[in-house]
């Protein structure tokens, strides 16, 4: 049998020598043998299929001559990046890669925490986690966005926040362990494709991690369980009073469909793109300023909306029960109209946004159903305006982006994406105007905020399916 050394294999396979050495050391290349300081690999070892994919031969642990299985991953883009990082960190190939898309919500913002309705999409950018098992129950995970590797045990996860990037994942471990006994840990690398802020990267990383951890423990979670456990981690451990908009979009969504969800009873519909609808793409305009949701005024806005509901019930003589179980969905619109002048101004504004957004969501779903993307886009612009004047969010940067979008040809509609304090704006655009839109928005935005050049960015995306194992 003829052999080639690691250097030659690297040239032939277009892989790094370090990666090939790691694969040999961990028995991932059948027939490889140590020779001095290098490894020798059989010449007939299966090579990459093409420039986009590669294969790793996994030898049977007891007998390397037994027929092997293969794990294939893309070598380009985000999947290849996280796989490379895993191999360079743990000196072996990952067993699996999980992916959860980011989400956008053109209409329905700030509604879910008061049991409103929402519309949304998943997009074809998101969070990847490359992972493999650790039989000792330890979770060891590193992020390509943050320094310092995090580590804890599935049976003794810290019960309080550690105030670092991995808190979302600790909370997810605790929430999952309440429902199912966890014995197997994992080693993992997590990577996000876009800057942080406005696309629900926090929910996406939790869902991706839960998919990986449950998979390693032989647990098959339903879509509803995945949403509920993810939301519990963010609410109870991280301390963010979010609803289920983010998680639902990232789990339920399907490419080419609009998610129409009622967060009161969790019923939803995936409305397909009408055959006569004009073409569209999704543009993400990052302001260049990132934000941390739990440290923002997000929770205060949620409390103000709930306070409005509680006060309206009291003013109308309705049973109002516990404060944390009160929501605007249980208060008829006519009661709000009758008593809104008696509410503190900020409370009335929060409620005004919620009720008008509820109407916009229903109108938007019908517009999408009949293929009228221009009407849907107009409602998204109205949603953005209400977020500024009634929900009272929006940094100077996001407000400027919003104003530019409303005056740009080829943009059907858009608004802040996410909480609306920093982060990004999203827009539904006519692909025929893509280049002109990018040029105009970029030029006018950087003219207003020249110090953000190099931080501001534009990304053109498409709708996508929800969470999946690759």
Q: Where on the chain are the PLM-derived regions?
A:
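C-terminal nucleotide
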Residues: 65-103, 107, 128-162, 257-415, ...
């Amino acid at each position: 049998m003829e052999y080639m050394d690691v250097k030659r294999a690297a040239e032939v396979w277009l892989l790094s020598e370090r990666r090939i050495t790691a694969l040999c050391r961990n028995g991932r290349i059948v027939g490889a043998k140590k020779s001095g300081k290098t490894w020798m690999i059989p010449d007939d070892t299966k090579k990459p299929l093409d420039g986009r994919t590669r294969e790793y031969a996994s030898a049977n642990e007891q007998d390397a001559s037994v027929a092997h299985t293969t794990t294939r991953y893309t070598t380009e883009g985000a999947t290849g990046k996280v796989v490379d990082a895993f191999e360079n960190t743990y000196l072996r190939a990952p067993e699996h890669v999980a992916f959860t898309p980011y989400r956008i919500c053109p209409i329905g913002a700030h509604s879910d925490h008061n049991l409103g309705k929402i519309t949304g999409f998943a997009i074809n950018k998101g969070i990847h986690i490359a992972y493999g098992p650790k039989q000792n129950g330890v979770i060891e995970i590193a992020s390509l966005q943050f320094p310092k590797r995090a580590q804890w045990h599935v049976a003794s996860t810290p019960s309080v926040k550690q105030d670092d990037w991995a808190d979302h994942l600790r909370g997810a471990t605790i929430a999952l362990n309440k429902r199912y006994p966890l014995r197997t840990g994992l080693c993992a690398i997590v990577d996000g494709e876009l800057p942080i802020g406005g696309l629900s990267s926090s929910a996406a990383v939790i869902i991706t991690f839960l998919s990986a951890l449950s998979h390693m423990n032989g647990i098959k979670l339903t879509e509803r369980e995945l949403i509920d456990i993810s939301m519990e981690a963010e609410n109870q451990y991280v301390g963010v009073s979010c609803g289920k908009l983010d998680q639902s979009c990232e789990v339920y969504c399907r490419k080419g469909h609009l998610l129409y969800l009622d967060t009161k009873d969790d019923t939803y519909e995936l409305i397909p793109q009408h055959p006569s609808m004009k073409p569209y793409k999704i543009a993400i305009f990052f302001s260049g300023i990132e934000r941390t949701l739990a440290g923002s005024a997000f929770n205060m806005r949620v409390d103000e909306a709930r306070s409005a509901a509680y006060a309206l019930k009291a003013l109308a003589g309705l049973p109002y029960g516990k404060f944390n179980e009160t929501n605007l969905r249980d208060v008829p619109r006519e009661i709000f109209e009758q008593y809104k002048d008696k509410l503190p101004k900020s409370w009335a504004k929060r409620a005004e946004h919620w009720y008008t957004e509820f109407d916009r969501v229903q109108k938007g779903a019908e517009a999408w159903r009949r293929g009228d993307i221009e009407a849907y886009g107009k409602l998204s612009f109205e949603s953005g305006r209400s977020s500024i004047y009634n929900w009272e969010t929006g940094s100077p940067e996001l407000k400027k982006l919003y104003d530019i979008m409303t005056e740009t040809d080829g943009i059907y509609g858009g608004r802040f994406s996410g909480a609306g304090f920093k982060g990004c704006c999203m827009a539904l655009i006519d692909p025929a105007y893509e280049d002109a839109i990018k040029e105009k928005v970029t030029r006018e935005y950087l003219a207003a905020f020249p110090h953000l050049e190099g931080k501001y960015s534009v990304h053109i995306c498409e709708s996508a399916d929800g969470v999946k194992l690759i």
